[in-house]
C-alpha cells in the first residue's frame, strides 16, 4: 500500500494573489486541500479605538481606509449613522449627489475585482479591460471630490461639494462607454472555455450556508437569494430609482464573478436616473459646527460593494464617540474561506479566494 504524507505550505503574507498582507497555511494531501488556517491582522490599525479619541467629523477620513476600493460607501454608512442618532434631515440634492458618488465608487470597486480575478487566473487581457474602464470612473470621482481613492467626501448633514460645472455632461458621455466596456469584458470571458471550466461548479455555496455565514451583497445573491439593502430596506433616495437585483443560481465562482459584471450595469442605470432627477437646492443641512449627538446608540447598515456594511456607534453626549464598531463585509466573507477550500485542489485556491472579493484593509480594521 502506497503511503502518503500530508504537507503544509505557507501562502503569504507577501503573495500577489492575496491582494494585501494576508497569510494562509494550507495542508495538502497530494494536490487536495484538507485543511486551511487563515491568519489575519497584518494590516490592523485600530481604527475603532482611534475613533474614540477623534471628534465625529475627524472620524470620516478613517472610514476611507477600510475598504479603500469602495470608500464612498464607508463614508456614507458612517455619516448616516450619526445623522440617524441626531435626527438630521439631509437636503434632497445632497442625497442625490451621495447616490451618484457611491454608485461610481461601487463600479470602480467591481472593476478592480474583475481585473484581479482575471489576472489571478492568467488572463492578462481580462485585467487590462476593466482597468481601462475604471479610469473613466476615477476621472469622474476626481472631478467630483478631488481624489481618486480615499475621498472623505461625505459630511454629517450632506456632502463636501456640489457637482462641479460640466460633471453631468461628462458623466453622460462616459456612462455609455462604461457599459460598452462591460459588454467587452463579458464577451472576453463568458465564452472562454478555460475560464468557464475553472469557475463553474467550483466552491458552490447554498443559500442556507450563505445566510448562516452572515454573507451579504453579491456573494449572497450569487447563491440565489434576492436581497439588496438598496431595494429591500432603501436608505438615502434609493427608493426613487428603478433597478434590478441580479442573482445567481449555484453560488459558485462563476456566479460570484458574473454578478459583479451585472451589478455594474445596474449602477450605471441608477446614476443615469439620478443625473436626470437631481433637484436644485442646498447640499448641507443646518448642523452645529461642533457635533455632539445626544446620549444613545445607533446601528446603521448600507449596501457596500463587498457586502453589508454596518456601523454601531455609542454616544455619551460628548464630541467624540464613546464606542464605534464596524461590521466589515470582507471580514465576514473571509471567515468562511476554510470551509470553501477543504476538498478543493491547490490550483483552485487562488480562484476561490479571488471570487469572494476581500480587501485586507477591510478585514483588518
UniProtKB/Swiss-Prot annotation:
GO cellular component: plasma membrane
Bilayer topology term: Peripheral membrane protein
Protein's cellular compartments: Cell membrane
EC number: 7.1.1.-
Major localization listed first in the record, in broad terms: membrane
GO MF terms held by the record: NAD binding; NADH:ubiquinone reductase (non-electrogenic) activity; quinone binding
Disulfide-linked positions: none
Catalysed reactions, as listed in the record: a quinone + NADH + 5 H(+)(in) = a quinol + NAD(+) + 4 H(+)(out)
Keywords for this protein: Cell membrane, Membrane, NAD, Quinone, Translocase, Transport
Family: Belongs to the complex I 49 kDa subunit family.
Protein name: NADH-quinone oxidoreductase subunit D
Amino acid at each position: 500500500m502506497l503511503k502518503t504524507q500530508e504537507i503544509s505550505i505557507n501562502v503569504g503574507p507577501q503573495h500577489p494573489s492575496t491582494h494585501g498582507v494576508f497569510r494562509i497555511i494550507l495542508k495538502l494531501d497530494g494536490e487536495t486541500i484538507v485543511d486551511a488556517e487563515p491568519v489575519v491582522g497584518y494590516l490592523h490599525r485600530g481604527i475603532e479605538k482611534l475613533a474614540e479619541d477623534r471628534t465625529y467629523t475627524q472620524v470620516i477620513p478613517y472610514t476611507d481606509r477600510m475598504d479603500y476600493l469602495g470608500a464612498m460607501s464607508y463614508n456614507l454608512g458612517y455619516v448616516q449613522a450619526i445623522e440617524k442618532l441626531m435626527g438630521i434631515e439631509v437636503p434632497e440634492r445632497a442625497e442625490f449627489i451621495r447616490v451618484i458618488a457611491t454608485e461610481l465608487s461601487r463600479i470602480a470597486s467591481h472593476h478592480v475585482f474583475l481585473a484581479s480575478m482575471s489576472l489571478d487566473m492568467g488572463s492578462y487581457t481580462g485585467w487590462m479591460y476593466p482597468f481601462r474602464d475604471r479610469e473613466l470612473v476615477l476621472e469622474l470621482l476626481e472631478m467630483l471630490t478631488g481624489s481618486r481613492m480615499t475621498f472623505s467626501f461625505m459630511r454629517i448633514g450632506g456632502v463636501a461639494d456640489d457637482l462641479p460645472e460640466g460633471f453631468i455632461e461628462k458623466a453622460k458621455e462616459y456612462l455609455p462607454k462604461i457599459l460598452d466596456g462591460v459588454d467587452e469584458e463579458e464577451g472576453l470571458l463568458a465564452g472562454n472555455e478555460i475560464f468557464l471550466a475553472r469557475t463553474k461548479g467550483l466552491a458552490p455555496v447554498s443559500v442556507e450556508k450563505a445566510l448562516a455565514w452572515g454573507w451579504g451583497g453579491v456573494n449572497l445573491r450569487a447563491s440565489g437569494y434576492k436581497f439588496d439593502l438598496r431595494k429591500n430596506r432603501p436608505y438615502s433616495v434609493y427608493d426613487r430609482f428603478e433597478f434590478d437585483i441580479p442573482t445567481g443560481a449555484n453560488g459558485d465562482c462563476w456566479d460570484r464573478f458574473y454578478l459583479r459584471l451585472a451589478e455594474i450595469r445596474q449602477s450605471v442605470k441608477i446614476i443615469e436616473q439620478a443625473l436626470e432627477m437631481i433637484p436644485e437646492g442646498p447640499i448641507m443641512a443646518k448642523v452645529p459646527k461642533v457635533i455632539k449627538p445626544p446620549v444613545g446608540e445607533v446601528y446603521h447598515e448600507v449596501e457596500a460593494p463587498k457586502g453589508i456594511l454596518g456601523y454601531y456607534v455609542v454616544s455619551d453626549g460628548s464630541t467624540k464617540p464613546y464606542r464605534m464598531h464596524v461590521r466589515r463585509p470582507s471580514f465576514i466573507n473571509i471567515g468562511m474561506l476554510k470551509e470553501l477550500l477543504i476538498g478543493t485542489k491547490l490550483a483552485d485556491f487562488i480562484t476561490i479566494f479571488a471570487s469572494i472579493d476581500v480587501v485586507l484593509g477591510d478585514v483588518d480594521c
